[in-house]
Curated annotation (Swiss-Prot):
Protein known as: Putative lipoprotein LpqT
Signal sequence interval, chain numbering: 1-23
Record Pfam families: Lpp-LpqN (PF10738)
One cellular-component annotation, GO: plasma membrane
Source organism per UniProt: Mycobacterium leprae (strain TN)
Localization per Swiss-Prot or TrEMBL: Cell membrane
Membrane topology: Lipid-anchor
Gene that produces this protein: lpqT
Lipidation (S-diacylglycerol cysteine): 24
PROSITE patterns in the record: PROKAR_LIPOPROTEIN
Residue positions of covalent lipid attachment, annotated as N-palmitoyl cysteine: 24
Lineage: superkingdom: Bacteria
Organismal lineage: Bacteria, Bacillati, Actinomycetota, Actinomycetes, Mycobacteriales
The entry's keywords: Cell membrane, Lipoprotein, Membrane, Palmitate, Signal
Length: 218
């Protein structure tokens, strides 16, 4: 089994971050706020953020990456908007599904892991958004820990600085459970990344992917 690596995705590289969305219906973000570097967060927490992969490792949970379409008893998929196409790179595992438009940005990255170990999904998901707080000049636009199709889920959306660019990212993590008798648990992550100054122009496609994202029993 392997350590779980999650990421806020660029087409050429993966950096650790977890970001996600709302349960039923998607709240349209205020894209005019994306370029700002001041945080919208008004409350503070005494708990230091613990990146989700680090938390899973600390409780003895490991994962094997699997193709999103291969989960028995579950449907995991995203739509491909017009003008988008599959993206491949030698550094990307074959189980990773990536679609992109016009090259590097915008991109959507879908990954799934078969989990091993004893854990409480409701506790694990509490750390689903922690990674985002560690990014340079991260500005939160939206956040949720509401269930997604009945499964534990975490969502965060925002913008941050990376390699001299301002990026906008939407990310959802879902922990679905397959049917009996095995009731196998998985971790599914969808991350959509665009240049912040193009987020408004790309918003229709991004929202179409968000609305069409499926994690549900067959």
């Amino acid at each position: 089994m392997q350590a779980i690596r999650l990421g806020l995705h660029t087409a050429a590289a993966v950096v650790t971050l977890s970001i996600s969305a709302v349960s039923c219906g998607t709240k349209t973000p205020d894209y005019q706020l994306i370029l700002s570097k001041s945080s919208t967060t008004t409350t503070t927490t005494p708990d230091k953020p613990i990146p989700l992969p680090q938390y899973l490792e600390s409780i003895g949970v490991t994962g094997q990456q699997v193709a999103p379409s291969s989960l028995p008893g579950l449907t995991v998929s995203i739509p491909t908007p017009p003008g988008w196409s599959p993206y491949s790179n030698p550094n990307i595992t074959p189980e990773t599904l990536i679609i992109a438009k016009s090259g590097k940005y915008p991109t959507a990255r879908l990954v799934a892991f078969k989990l091993r170990g004893d854990f409480d999904p409701t506790q694990v998901i509490k750390h689903g958004n922690d990674d985002a707080q560690l990014f340079e000049n991260f500005r939160q636009l939206d956040v949720s820990t509401a269930n997604y199709n009945g499964f534990p889920s975490a969502m965060i959306q925002g913008s941050y600085d990376l390699e001299g660019r301002r990026l906008h990212a939407w990310n959802r993590i879902v922990i679905p459970t397959g049917p009996p008798p095995s009731k196998q648990q998985y971790l599914v992550q969808l991350t959509i990344t665009s240049l912040a100054n193009e987020a408004v122009a790309q918003s229709n496609d991004i929202e179409a992917i968000i609305r069409g994202f499926v994690v549900a029993p067959k």
